[in-house]
Swiss-Prot record:
It is an enzyme of class 2 (transferase). Its EC number is 2.1.1.33. Catalyzes the formation of N(7)-methylguanine at position 46 (m7G46) in tRNA. One of its GO terms (cellular component) is tRNA methyltransferase complex. This is tRNA (guanine-N(7)-)-methyltransferase. The lineage of its organism: Bacteria, Pseudomonadati, Pseudomonadota, Gammaproteobacteria, Vibrionales. It comes from the Bacteria. It comes from Vibrio cholerae serotype O1 (strain ATCC 39315 / El Tor Inaba N16961).
Length: 239
């Protein structure tokens, strides 16, 4: 296992200090996940390296790129890729069993427009994602850090929003978030309303109806069972 370092923020979103946000635990891969990693990584896996990706080289075409941070076991990401062959998808997940499961599902579904990485997303963004190149960034059901004293650990902060803004296409790129914690949804809206260069795409209030392109995830199903709502939030890069 290896430690992943992220930032701690003040209330106004400025970096206070670098902290350990989580420890990357490799976990135990099932035989199927291990086989999928060995078989599919050469064609679908991208190793971390501190140089910018060339999307044409990665996918073999110039289709719009959708990037998802923290795809879990990858079921919804694979479904989205299968349902939208006209788009390219890149998923970033730090837990290798999830990456293995995603690759196994992708192989079974026969998708060819999906690539995956097993690395800290902040480092990937800083060193590998070209500016002004993403059609959509997806952040679905991130850790809510529901205790108030842990809110500063939430990934959606002003510095993160600025990092996202730089990578989205000007005038069209969309940052799509979803959470089943109302307080985190309110936090997301508060941060994004303060972040320069974004406009909320909701036509009624702060939230959009669940888009057809986002499959029903196990997290959302859990939320329904617990009586939680689910909030979808979309902001478009305007500048």
């Amino acid at each position: 296992m290896s430690e992943v370092i992220t930032q701690e923020y003040t209330e106004d979103g400025k970096v206070l200090r670098r902290i350990r946000s989580f420890v990357r635990r490799e976990g135990r891969l099932t035989k199927g996940q291990e086989a999928a990693m060995k078989e599919c990584w050469p064609t679908m896996g991208i190793d971390y390296q501190p140089e910018l990706l060339d999307w044409q080289q990665v996918f073999g075409n110039d289709n719009p790129v959708v990037l998802e941070i923290g795809f879990g076991m990858g079921a919804s990401l694979v479904e989205m890729a299968k349902n939208a062959p006209e788009k390219n998808f890149l998923g970033i997940e730090v837990h290798s069993p999830g990456v293995g499961a995603c690759l196994a599902s992708a192989r079974e579904a026969g998708v060819t427009n999906l690539r995956v990485m097993c690395h800290d997303a902040v480092e990937v963004f800083a060193h590998m994602i070209p500016d002004n190149s993403l059609h959509t960034l997806q952040l679905f059901f991130p850790d809510p850090w529901h205790k108030k004293r842990h809110h500063k650990r939430r990934i959606v902060q002003l510095e993160f929003a600025e990092m996202v803004r730089q990578k989205l296409m000007i005038g069209s790129g969309v940052f799509h978030m979803a959470t089943d914690w109302e307080n985190y949804a309110e936090h997301m809206v508060e941060v994004m309303n303060q972040a320069p260069g974004f406009a909320n795409l909701a036509t009624d209030g702060d939230y959009v109806p669940r888009p057809d392109e986002r499959p029903l995830t196990k997290f959302e199903q859990r939320g329904h069972r617990l009586g939680h709502g689910v909030w979808d939030i979309k902001y478009q890069r305007t500048a």
